[in-house]
Swiss-Prot record:
Top-level division of the source organism's lineage: Bacteria
The entry's keywords: Carbohydrate metabolism, Cytoplasm, Isomerase, Magnesium, Metal-binding, Xylose metabolism
UniProt-annotated binding residues for Mg(2+) 2: E268, H271, D307, D309
Compartmental location: Cytoplasm
Name of this protein: Xylose isomerase
Organism of provenance: Lactococcus lactis subsp. cremoris (strain SK11)
Amino acid sequence: MAYFNDIAPIKYEGTKTKNMFAFRHYNPEEVVAGKTMEEQLHFALAFWHTITMDGADPFGSATMERPWDLEGGSELDRAHRRVDAFFEIAEKLGVKYYCFHDIDIAPTGNSLKEFYANLDEITDHLLEKQKETGIKLLWNTANMFSNPRYMNGVSTSNRAEVFAYGAAQVKKGLELSKKLGGENYVFWGGREGYESLLNTDMGLEMDHMAKFFHLAIDYAKSINHLPIFLIELKPKEPMTHQYDFDAATALAFLQKYDLDKYFKLNIETNHAWLAGHTFEHELNTARTFGALGSIDANQGNYLLGWDTDEFPTLVIDITLQGWILMHVRLKVQQPSLKTNSCLISLKNVIVHTRRQKLVNLSKMEQQLLKVLLLMLLSMGMTSNLILTT
């Protein structure tokens, strides 16, 4: 079923266009530094904010009703509809890559065996869509932070059965990565850290975390599929302190445990700010050590101490880092747009920057953006960019 019949594919129309559903500055066919923009910038659409987000937050329930979630049937039926809607959005935007957590795409069922079966069925559908559209899997990951079993971590948990369950999720995730041709595999240790040092053996926990990563590497080698492993950095939230605090901390960990030749870093703007750094600092640290793997582009709120995934609002902040599109959440206060709430996914990506008056760049500013992109390319500072809506 199609959900966006009334929206044509988004094309580049230049800065003077009045069409809100058009790119004004991103021209995928324009050559910059010997390659097209599309070749230089591997934009990826993320499954979670784009398709599964319902507007719930820690203080309230869902505010959004997605058309693909309202048509009845089983949880698997809904999962298949989500795949169709997702690839339709990606095609409309011209995005060539995508990313997902395992629980984003398939229901977990009542057992690990049932979860595996659901993942197999849905990834068959994903593979069909990949072949049909040419869209590729940039990275996938296992959600090892939402279920209550992971409240004290996975690899750093004091319960062996929790460690084992998480390892089983990663095992399946690597098999799915091979099946779908994934280029990277991500670890975000949202609960790999501590609430208090009074009951924490930090050295032991980091030993266990390193062992977990080595097991993942060994298994990837055993199935002849060794993607680039990425650690997504975040200093806190939900834990008081997380072991992937920032680029320097993660690099020290990787070097200590002989993991640095297998891992690179996934840098997110908002997470850098939470660590007390600028995004530029984290990018430069990763680049200096040859560990810049992927970018989640967004911004936070300097006055808040938690992750907000907001749209960038200043031209200089966008151009300095080479941001083009951004890792952002739908607003809880945006339950609908016209009659289809699903249109928000497209409209936020294309129109929100217009509301913030970022697209009305002068010719000089346009040239500055291109010069900065060339500088970033020469410094090796452009890599995979994650676009989540």
